């Protein structure tokens, strides 16, 4: 909700501080004041050309997140937020395209190739959803996510 640095600052500059204020109000009401990494929501921007913002944090405060699956988690959450939005939206209010920044590449210091791998994996898993939930699948997904070069054991 603190949209005053990096890509967030550019978003606030473009849409105005009213958007940041509404994002913060949503976080206060829906997340008791702290939106966890790995969650996301869609909010109206008030701009007809760019009608929605998906708020999907990659960190609570600025810090290095290289070596984690945070980029995957934030991307996955953003995709799920769009999916949820589209399930209940009227046809003319559905989100049909999304622009993502290189999540975690700024102050998070995740290398661009790792960002791309984690975001691509989230997308591929989203468009090819699992058909069962079991330990084999969970272990496989974990191995997929941490096979990106962002993971440094």
Region spans (language model):
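Macrodomain-like recognition of ADP-ribose-binding/processing modules
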Residues: 1-153
């Amino acid at each position: 909700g603190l949209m005053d640095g990096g890509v967030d600052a550019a978003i606030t500059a473009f849409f105005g501080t009213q958007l940041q204020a509404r994002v913060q109000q949503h976080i206060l009401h829906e997340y008791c004041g702290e939106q966890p990494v790995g969650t996301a929501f869609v909010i109206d921007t008030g701009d007809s050309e760019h009608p929605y913002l998906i708020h999907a944090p990659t960190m609570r405060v600025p810090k290095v997140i290289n070596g984690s699956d945070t980029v995957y988690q934030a991307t996955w959450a953003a995709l799920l937020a769009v999916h949820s939005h589209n399930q209940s939206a009227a046809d003319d209010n559905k989100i049909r395209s999304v622009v993502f920044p290189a999540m975690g590449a700024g102050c998070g210091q995740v290398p661009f190739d790792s960002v791309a791998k984690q975001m691509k994996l989230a997308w591929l898993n989203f468009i090819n959803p699992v058909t069962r939930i079991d330990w084999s699948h969970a272990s496989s997904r974990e191995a997929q996510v941490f096979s990106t070069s962002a993971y440094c054991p």
